[in-house]
């Protein structure tokens, strides 16, 4: 498992490397180029379930120490980890379906108690102090 310090620094270095490639590109304003070096936000999603990373709290603390906001997206399947998650800038729960059967079909969950886990995570949102968001997935019934 990679340590959070290495992940944060690696992500920042990769970001800087990409921004440097824009130097001298026609249409890129110098002030915008410089602004690109000041990372302000980090979205933790689309790379698996971020709250399953054992060092997620340290990772987000490192971001916050650097003045970087943290946007974390969870699939609402890990209520115990959600209880121990320290505040992030904004916490999203993906709502991929509105019924147990639809959620099973859409997400193909690994745990038999997926619906109970899902509803438990939703209930926990009411106890959290940071901004929270339901991220809805809309689609036709199949």
Q: What is the meaning of each model-derived region?
A:
Residues 8-142:
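Conserved AdoMet/S-adenosylmethionine-binding subsite of the radical SAM
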Residues 1:
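Local cysteine-cluster metal-coordination motifs and their immediate loop/turn environment
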């Amino acid at each position: 498992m990679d340590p959070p310090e290495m992940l944060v620094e690696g992500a920042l270095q990769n970001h800087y490397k990409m921004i440097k490639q824009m130097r001298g590109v026609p249409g890129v304003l110098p002030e915008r180029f410089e602004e690109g070096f000041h990372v302000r936000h980090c979205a933790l999603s689309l790379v698996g379930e971020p709250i399953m990373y054992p060092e997620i709290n340290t990772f987000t603390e490192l971001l916050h120490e650097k003045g970087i906001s943290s946007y974390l997206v969870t699939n609402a399947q890990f209520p115990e980890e959600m209880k121990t998650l320290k505040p992030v800038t904004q916490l999203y729960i993906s709502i991929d379906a509105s019924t147990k059967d639809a959620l099973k079909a859409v997400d193909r969950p690994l745990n038999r108690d997926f619906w109970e886990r899902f509803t438990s995570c939703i209930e926990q949102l009411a106890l959290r102090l940071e901004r929270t968001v339901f991220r809805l997935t809309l689609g036709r019934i199949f």
